[in-house]
UniProtKB/Swiss-Prot annotation:
Pathway: Pyrimidine metabolism; UMP biosynthesis via salvage pathway; UMP from uracil: step 1/1
EC id: 2.4.2.9
Entry-linked CDD domains: PRTases_typeI
SUPFAM superfamilies attached to this UniProt entry: PRTase-like (SSF53271)
Cofactor, free-text remark: Binds 1 Mg(2+) ion per subunit. The magnesium is bound as Mg-PRPP.
Lineage: Bacteria, Pseudomonadati, Thermodesulfobacteriota, Desulfovibrionia, Desulfovibrionales
InterPro entries tied to this protein: PRibTrfase_dom (IPR000836), PRTase-like (IPR029057), Upp_B (IPR034332), UPRTase/APRTase (IPR050054), Ura_phspho_trans (IPR005765)
Positions bound to 5-phospho-alpha-D-ribose 1-diphosphate: R78, R103, D130, P131, M132, L133, A134, T135, G136, G137, T138, D199
Name of this chain's protein: Uracil phosphoribosyltransferase
Catalytic activity: UMP + diphosphate = 5-phospho-alpha-D-ribose 1-diphosphate + uracil
Cofactor requirement: Mg(2+)
Keywords assigned by UniProt, alphabetized: Allosteric enzyme, Glycosyltransferase, GTP-binding, Magnesium, Nucleotide-binding, Transferase
GO biological processes: UMP salvage; uracil salvage
Length: 208
């Protein structure tokens, strides 16, 4: 399974700021979007382009333009919305598909409560957004949904990942590409990532 840890000084610095326990909602939102933007840069660098001649200020000029399948960004509600603006900044015309999942705190398994996918999603590459890949249950359920809808190329963008979640993804969907700012140490007994970020959804939305 292709896993890319985006090892860049800016990413490491911004992730370090995100880990501060008393970070403000404003700063957490801004940093999550900034890292999302940097992850998008890495995740899209293999997109195909073609040469096209346009009319420049001094006459015809040959440029590169994206070609091929379009992308749909898939934020997993609610925390995935905290990375979406950064991605949309990089790909302004991207279509947004929304998947609502929450994790049952007792079983740690995902529960789906809302789905709204882009039209002709089977013709698009899907880019899943979720700040944290913990047990992998929510991610696997989302990938199952997208594959059932016809998606053939799926990637996931995460601020931090747990080894346990990556192992589950490797077992169930080894074809999915992962882009992350860090792979953390482990999950605790409650299924939270250590050292992690705390509850990313609460920090993004200012709730508890």
């Amino acid at each position: 399974m292709p896993v890319t840890v985006v090892d860049h000084p800016l990413v490491r610095h911004k992730l370090g700021l995100l880990r501060e326990n008393n970070i403000s909602t404003k700063n957490f939102r801004e940093l999550a979007n900034e890292i999302g933007r940097l992850l998008t840069y890495e995740a899209t660098k293999s997109l195909p382009t073609e040469k096209k001649t346009i009319h420049g200020w001094a006459g015809p000029v040959e440029v590169d333009q994206l070609v091929g399948k379009k992308i749909t960004v898939v934020p997993i509600l609610r925390a995935g919305l905290g990375m979406m603006d950064g991605v949309v900044d990089m790909i302004p015309g991207v279509k947004v598909s929304v998947v609502g999942m929450y994790r049952n705190e007792e079983t740690l398994e995902p529960v789906r409560y809302y789905v709204k996918l882009a039209k002709k999603i089977h013709k698009r590459h899907a880019m899943i957004l979720d700040p944290m890949l913990a047990t992998g249950g929510t991610l696997v359920a989302t990938i199952n949904l997208l594959k059932e809808a016809g998606c053939r190329r799926i990637m996931g963008l995460f601020l931090v990942c747990a080894p346990e979640g990556l192992a589950r993804l490797e077992k169930e969907h080894p074809d999915v590409e992962v882009y992350t700012a860090a792979i953390d140490e482990r999950l605790n007994e409650n299924g939270y990532i250590l050292p992690g970020l705390g509850d990313a959804g609460d920090k993004i939305f200012g709730t508890k």
